[in-house]
């Protein structure tokens, strides 16, 4: 072969190799994630998402063991990807965050959320950004959280005093009495968020019926908000309401609208009469919406009711869920409970009540909160997202309009990150994971999500969790009502509330004068 022929052959080989590499790269960039098996004809994996095969986050976690940290499922006519590794989630919530910050259109958003006016259901856009900014600045900013200190402190003190009164009334010669804590935690959470948002609280007596009504509506709201109905999977079956779920959604939405509408009317009457200055978030909203140019089709009343309603429902349920799981875990691990009480006795003592200025010194208590949020994130699957652009994530191509499900429960039990991931061991946050935070910067631990759609009330929620847990552990000796471990069964839904009651034996451990 002469020189020119050799050069031509080499150039041809290089060209062919280049074309092959370009084709290979193009093919790899359009490679879809592996598809999970077990799909039903027509329905796809709807049986898993709807909870018919068990808790959805657990079932999806089992599929991740087979298919890896990113895999595809079908929900009727919709394609979805499920992710559960910190590397993939970081890529989604940083590089691709804007593209994955929208929500799919589901019946809960239409019927329960004022036709997607509620922040949690509205898609990423101008309206969402305006409402998010208002909520972040006027309710959950560091300045506002500090200004609301008295609400947290007074409601926590009332909660402790009510527990002491229950002990006094029921003790009947015994040093310990049994109380059911799920309901009490729900009342506490509701009163705190109601006071902040609408300036209201329920204290029993004449308020008892309205309190029960409010809690029932909020519970029903969260239960229904987590349901996938048939027409979510098959939009062309929107006329078919199998199981009556849409009818229940509409009825609950009417009750929610009536409740929040009554509070809004009270605030308007107060505003017109000139009574007092703006004190709660609803007052602030009434002031802010005057002359504001919200780029949306909603009227002012709808915006106020939708925003306040979602804050009350979300703040009540998610905070109570974490209180319940934290106490249940402590009762099943009494050595951890005793260690936390020893820390309180050392740094605070028993001659005064713990206060917020003490919390930074209670590092073991903070570790307990982190470990609770790791094992039982209040929304184990977060909220379903919808991609508004094609994305390349984890080596896979994910097309526009795909639904995204982030399995926080599985993420937080990754054995590559957490030793003995299913064990409750707060000490892990005093050792190797000491610097790991829960505020969306460490993608191995994101119980409040991350990126643009991180929970705006994260700082407030953590402050409340620490104060209530510290106050409860300082004020009472706590134990199980029997030798059997606390039942840790979860309920399926938007939040994973404990499926069974939480009965606890309590006895005071402070001087009686501190319970007044």
UniProtKB/Swiss-Prot annotation:
Pathway in which this enzyme or protein is active: Flavonoid metabolism
Membrane topology term: Single-pass membrane protein
Assigned EC number: 1.14.14.-
Record localization: Membrane
Keyword flag Lipoprotein: no
Function: 6-OH hydroxylase involved in the biosynthesis of polymethoxylated flavonoids natural products such as pebrellin, aroma compounds which contribute to the flavor of peppermint, and exhibit pharmacological activities such as anti-allergic, anti-oxidant, antibacterial, anti-proliferative, and anti-inflammatory effects. Catalyzes the 6-hydroxylation of 7-O-methylated precursors such as the conversion of genkwanin (GENK) to scutellarein-7-methyl ether (SCU7Me). Can also use apigenin-7,4'-dimethyl ether (AdM), naringenin-7-methyl ether (SAK) and naringenin-7,4'-dimethyl ether (NdM) as substrates.
Sequence similarity: Belongs to the cytochrome P450 family.
Name listed for the protein in its UniProt record: Flavonoid-6-hydroxylase
Species lineage: Eukaryota, Viridiplantae, Streptophyta, Embryophyta, Tracheophyta
């Amino acid at each position: 072969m002469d020189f020119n022929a050799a050069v031509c052959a080499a150039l041809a080989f290089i060209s062919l190799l280049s074309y092959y590499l370009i084709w290979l790269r193009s093919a790899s960039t359009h490679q879809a994630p592996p598809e999970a098996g077990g799909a039903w004809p027509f329905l796809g994996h709807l049986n898993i998402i709807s909870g018919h095969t068990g808790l959805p986050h657990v079932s999806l976690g089992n599929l991740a063991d087979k298919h890896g940290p990113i895999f595809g499922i079908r929900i009727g006519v919709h394609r979805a990807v499920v992710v559960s590794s910190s590397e993939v989630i970081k890529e989604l919530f940083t590089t691709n965050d804007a593209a994955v910050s929208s929500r799919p259109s589901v019946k809960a958003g239409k019927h329960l959320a004022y036709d997607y006016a509620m922040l949690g259901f509205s898609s990423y856009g101008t309206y969402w950004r305006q409402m998010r900014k208002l909520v972040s600045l006027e309710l959950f900013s560091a300045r506002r959280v500090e200004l609301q200190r008295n609400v947290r402190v007074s409601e926590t003190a009332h909660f402790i005093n009510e527990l002491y009164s229950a002990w006094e009334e029921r003790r009947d010669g015994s040093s310990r009495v049994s109380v059911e804590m799920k309901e009490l935690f729900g009342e506490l959470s509701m009163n705190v968020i109601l006071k902040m948002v609408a300036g209201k609280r329920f204290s029993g007596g004449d308020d008892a019926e309205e309190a029960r009504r409010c809690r029932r509506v909020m519970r029903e709201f969260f239960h229904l908000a987590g349901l996938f109905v048939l027409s979510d999977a098959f939009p062309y079956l929107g006329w078919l309401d199998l199981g009556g779920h849409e009818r229940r959604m509409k009825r609950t939405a009417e009750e929610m609208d009536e409740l929040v509408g009554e509070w809004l009317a009270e605030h308007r009457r107060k505003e017109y009469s000139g009574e007092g200055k703006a004190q709660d978030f609803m007052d602030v909203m009434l002031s802010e919406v005057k002359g504001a140019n919200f780029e949306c089709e909603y009227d002012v009343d709808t915006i106020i009711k939708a925003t306040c309603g979602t804050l009350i429902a979300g703040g009540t349920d998610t905070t109570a869920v974490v209180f319940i799981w934290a106490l249940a875990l402590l009762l099943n691990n009494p050595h951890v409970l005793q260690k936390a009480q020893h820390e309180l006795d050392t740094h605070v003592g028993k001659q005064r009540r713990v206060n917020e200025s003490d919390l930074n010194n209670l590092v073991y208590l903070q570790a307990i909160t982190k470990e609770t949020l790791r094992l039982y994130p209040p929304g184990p699957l977060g909220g379903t997202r919808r991609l508004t652009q094609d994305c390349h994530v984890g080596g896979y191509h994910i097309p526009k309009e795909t639904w995204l499900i982030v399995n926080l429960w599985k993420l937080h039990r990754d054995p590559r990150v957490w030793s003995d991931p299913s064990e409750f061991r707060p000490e892990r946050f005093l050792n190797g994971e000491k610097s790991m935070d829960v505020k969306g910067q460490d993608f191995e631990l994101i119980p409040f999500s991350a990126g643009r759609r991180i929970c705006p009330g994260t700082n407030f929620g953590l402050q409340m969790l620490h104060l209530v847990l510290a106050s409860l552990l300082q004020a009472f000796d706590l134990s199980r009502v029997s030798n059997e471990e606390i039942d840790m069964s979860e309920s399926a839904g938007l939040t994973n509330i404990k499926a069974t009651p939480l009965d606890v034996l309590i006895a005071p451990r402070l001087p009686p004068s501190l319970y007044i």
